[in-house]
A protein has these predicted regions:
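N-terminal auxiliary "cap/dimerization" subdomain that precedes the catalytic jelly-roll/cupin core
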Residues: 2-149, 339-351
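Catalytic core of Fe(II)/2-oxoglutarate
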Residues: 3-45, 217, 224-229, 239, ...
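Short beta-strand segments
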Residues: 111-113, 210, 232, 289, ...
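Signature of the catalytic double-stranded beta-helix
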Residues: 147-209, 213, 225
Length: 351
C-alpha cells in the first residue's frame, strides 16, 4: 500500500510538473500556426508581386518593340494604306475563293491557294508581331487574339483589316456561297429539315479571330469545333522557305454521329475511330476552309522537329450570332434542343 501511495504521489507531482510544459507547448503550437499562416500570406503576396513584375517587364518589352518597329515599318504602313484604299485585296480574295474547287471527301472543304495579292501577303507576314506579344503560358502553343490591345502599328492595323474587313466583306460572303449546298444539309442535321429555311436566313459573321503560333511538341487530337461554328477558316502564314509539313490533318470518322453538346467534340472519346485521310500542307498564302459537320481535323508537330520550327496561322469561325442562334434553338423540338444545351467538358486542351 505504501508503494501504491508513493506511485500516486509521484504521478501527481509529475502532472504538476508537466502542466506548465503542456501549456507552453499549446502556446507554441498556436504561435507556429500563426507563423505558418503569416508565411502563407507572405508567399501569396510575394507571388502576386512576382507576377506583377513579370507583367511589367513584358509590357516594357512590348513598348520598346512597338517604338522600334513603328519606325522600321513607316513605309510599309503607307503601302498598306494604299492597298486598303483601292480595294484590290478584297477583289483578289473573292476571285481566288470563287475559282477554287470544293472537295467533298471526307467532308466538304477547300484549300485556296494564292489567297492574297503577293504584295499584301508580304505585308501580312511583316505584320506578324514578335513573340512577346503572344500569350506566354505555353511556349508550344501561343495565341494572339484580335484586336490587339497594344502592339506595333503595322500589326494592329493589318490584323484589324484582316479581321474587320477581309474576313467580313470578302471571305465570309465568298465561302458562304461556295458552301451553300453543304450548309443546307448541315442545317437539316442540326435543326431539322423543317427549320432549314429559317437557319439559312440567319446572318452569319466571323468570330474568334486569333493569330496562332505553334512549335515542336504541339498535338491536337482529332476533333470538331464548337457547334455554333458552321465554317472554320485557317489562313496559313508560312514563309517562302518554310517546310510544308505539319499542316492541318483531315480525318474520316468511322461510326460518326452528331455531338450531343455544343462544346468541341472529340470522336475518339465517344468510341469512334479516326482515319487520317490527308494533311493539308502548310503553304504560303493559302487558306483551308471546312464545314464543321462530320469527320474531324487535328494537328501534330513532333517533339523532335527542328527547334527553330514555327507554324503561324490565323483562324476564325463563321456562324450565326449567339442571340439569333438561341432564338432558333428555343423553337426546336425538345430532343434537338437538348443537343444544344447539354454541356460536355473534355480533358483536351483547346486549339
Amino acid at each position: 500500500m505504501l508503494i501504491r501511495y508513493a506511485k500516486d504521489a509521484a504521478a501527481r507531482a509529475l502532472r504538476r510538473l508537466l502542466a506548465p510544459m503542456r501549456q507552453d507547448i499549446g502556446e507554441l503550437r498556436k504561435e507556429l500556426r500563426s507563423m505558418s499562416s503569416q508565411l502563407e500570406g507572405l508567399e501569396g503576396r510575394l507571388g502576386a508581386l512576382d507576377e506583377k513584375a513579370t507583367r511589367a517587364d513584358r509590357v516594357s518589352t512590348q513598348l520598346r518593340l512597338t517604338l522600334r518597329l513603328n519606325d522600321k515599318h513607316r513605309d510599309t504602313l503607307a503601302r498598306l494604306d494604299a492597298m486598303v484604299a483601292d480595294g484590290s485585296v478584297l477583289g483578289h480574295v473573292r476571285h481566288a475563293i470563287a475559282n477554287t474547287r470544293l472537295d467533298l471527301d471526307p467532308y466538304p472543304h477547300m484549300v485556296v491557294n494564292d489567297l492574297f495579292p503577293p504584295a499584301f501577303y508580304k505585308i501580312l507576314r511583316d505584320a506578324i508581331p514578335p513573340q512577346p506579344f503572344f500569350m506566354d503560358r505555353d511556349p508550344i502553343k501561343q495565341n494572339l487574339k484580335t484586336p490587339m490591345d497594344l502592339g506595333p502599328a503595322l500589326s494592329v492595323r493589318t490584323l484589324d483589316y484582316l479581321d474587320d474587313v477581309i474576313a467580313r466583306e470578302a471571305i465570309r460572303p465568298a465561302v458562304m456561297e461556295k458552301f451553300h449546298e453543304p450548309l443546307q444539309s448541315l442545317y437539316d442535321t442540326l435543326f431539322g429539315p423543317e427549320f432549314r429555311a429559317r437557319a439559312d436566313q440567319m446572318p452569319q459573321a466571323p468570330s474568334g479571330g486569333r493569330l496562332m503560333l505553334r512549335r515542336p511538341g504541339y498535338f491536337l487530337a482529332p476533333h470538331r469545333d464548337p457547334k455554333r461554328a458552321m465554317l472554320t477558316c485557317l489562313l496559313y502564314l508560312a514563309g517562302a522557305r518554310d517546310d510544308e509539313a505539319y499542316g492541318t490533318q483531315i480525318f474520316r470518322v468511322a461510326d460518326d454521329r452528331e455531338a450531343t453538346f455544343t462544346h468541341t467534340y472529340y470522336p475518339e472519346e465517344h468510341g469512334s475511330r479516326c482515319e487520317l485521310v490527308k494533311t493539308v500542307p502548310y503553304r504560303p498564302n493559302s487558306m483551308l476552309v471546312f464545314l464543321n459537320s462530320t469527320g474531324a481535323h487535328g494537328a501534330a508537330i513532333p517533339p523532335d522537329a527542328p527547334a527553330t520550327l514555327e507554324r503561324f496561322t490565323y483562324q476564325f469561325y463563321i456562324g450565326p450570332g449567339a442571340e439569333t442562334l438561341n432564338d432558333l434553338v428555343k423553337e426546336l423540338p425538345p430532343e434537338r434542343q437538348a443537343k444544344w444545351t447539354s454541356p460536355k467538358a473534355s480533358g483536351h486542351a483547346a486549339m
